[in-house]
Amino acid sequence: MPSFDIVSEVDLQEARNAVDNASREVESRFDFRNVEYSFELNDASKTIKVLSESDFQVNQLLDILRAKLLKRGIEGSSLDVPENIVHSGKTWFVEAKLKQGIESATQKKIVKMIKDSKLKVQAQIQGDEIRVTGKSRDDLQAVMAMVRGGDLGQPFQFKNFRD
């Protein structure tokens, strides 16, 4: 029986490349001359810390980072940025988290969405991924299109497609 897995992962090497590219772009920008700023990627906690001298500049740096992530194939919705920007001394910073895995509430929404579609497929939650099996390859492709089209707040990848 054909099957595939629905996962939500961010390639940390590509994220590191995007952070380096964003840092390189900011170095050459006139509006960031003589401004203290930094991008720090923490592999262990999967966070990106953006630091600058004002909250407006932090928002500009986040926009640059999102653009560079998108160029490297990482969707902007995989970056979870908190609303409040922290002020500490003369610097402002925000610690954005990269979404890895699918939360259980989102998993349940996806499984319910698949079951409500009345397609002849089964969906099973396995850890932080969802395995979808069915008799028809067309049904599985319909599920892929439905998950891509559903507004669930994070990007999904499809792996291990087997016939």
Curated annotation (Swiss-Prot):
Q: Which organism is it from?
A: Shigella flexneri
Name the CDD domains for this protein. YajQ_like (cd11740)
Give the family this protein belongs to, as stated in its UniProt record.
Belongs to the YajQ family.
Q: Which gene encodes it?
A: yajQ
Q: What does this protein do?
A: Nucleotide-binding protein.
Question: What is the superkingdom listed in this entry's lineage?
Answer: Bacteria
Gene Ontology MF terms:
nucleotide binding
Provide the protein name: Nucleotide-binding protein YajQ
Q: Which UniProt keywords apply?
A: Nucleotide-binding
Please tell me whether the keyword Nucleotide-binding is annotated for this protein: yes
InterPro entries to which the protein is assigned, alphabetical: DUF520 (IPR007551), UPF0234-like_C (IPR035571), UPF0234_N (IPR035570), YajQ-like_sf (IPR036183)
Query: What SUPFAM superfamilies has UniProt attached to this entry?
Result: YajQ-like
UniProt entry tagged with the keyword Disulfide bond: no
Q: One Pfam family, short name please? A: DUF520
Q: For this UniProt entry, what's an example GO CC term?
A: cytosol
**From which residue to which does any coiled coil extend?**
none
